[in-house]
Amino acid sequence: MANETNAVEAAAAVAGHAAEAAEKGGMPQLDFSTFPNQIFWLLLALGAIYWLLKNIAIPRIAAILADRAGTISGDLAAAEQYKLKAKDAEAAYAKALADARAQAQKIIAETRAVIQKDLDAATAKADADIAARVAQSEVKIAEIRAGALEAVQIVATDTATAIVTALGGKADMGALNAAVGQRVKG
């Protein structure tokens, strides 16, 4: 019950203040009798806000901005260093690649020279071997012409034997002599 009594008294007090304000009329902010007091508190509040901004907020913001600017400039400097290192690495890579290509070309040229030398030697040997065989063949041809029919038959038999052997067969001498004799005679 005591609470209800207090609530009723509070409501009556508020109603009394409202009635008093209604009698004065107008808005309290526009009451010229309170302007000096309002101006004082306005200036005091603005001064406090100015002091807080000047001494606390703006220095903190400036420190954060300076820290960011330092970080950004440091990052840009590091990026520039990395860029220079990358250019140096690229130049070194290009030089190494060019050196490797030159070395490869040199090795290729040396290998070609060695192969050509070996090929020339093999060709010369083959030419000499062919020339020797040609000379031997010419001697045999001269002997065959000089030795007449019997020599032709011997050479033909030897040639047929060599051909059969070269082809991987076994030469039957009797059959070969008969075949060669028949061909030579006619």
From Swiss-Prot:
It is found in: Cellular chromatophore membrane. The keyword Ion transport applies. InterPro entries: ATP_synth_b/b'su_bac/chlpt, ATP_synthase_B_chain. The chain crosses the membrane at residues 39-59. One of its GO terms (cellular component) is plasma membrane. It comes from the Bacteria. It is a single-pass membrane protein. CDD domains: ATP-synt_Fo_b. Keywords: ATP synthesis, CF(0), Hydrogen ion transport, Ion transport, Membrane, Transmembrane, Transmembrane helix, Transport. One of its GO terms (molecular function) is proton-transporting ATP synthase activity, rotational mechanism. F(1)F(0) ATP synthase produces ATP from ADP in the presence of a proton or sodium gradient. F-type ATPases consist of two structural domains, F(1) containing the extramembraneous catalytic core and F(0) containing the membrane proton channel, linked together by a central stalk and a peripheral stalk. During catalysis, ATP synthesis in the catalytic domain of F(1) is coupled via a rotary mechanism of the central stalk subunits to proton translocation. Belongs to the ATPase B chain family. F-type ATPases have 2 components, F(1) - the catalytic core - and F(0) - the membrane proton channel. F(1) has five subunits: alpha(3), beta(3), gamma(1), delta(1), epsilon(1). F(0) has four main subunits: a(1), b(1), b'(1) and c(10-14). The alpha and beta chains form an alternating ring which encloses part of the gamma chain. F(1) is attached to F(0) by a central stalk formed by the gamma and epsilon chains, while a peripheral stalk is formed by the delta, b and b' chains. HAMAP family: ATP_synth_b_bprime. This is ATP synthase subunit b'. The lineage of its organism: Bacteria, Pseudomonadati, Pseudomonadota, Alphaproteobacteria, Rhodobacterales. The gene is atpF2.
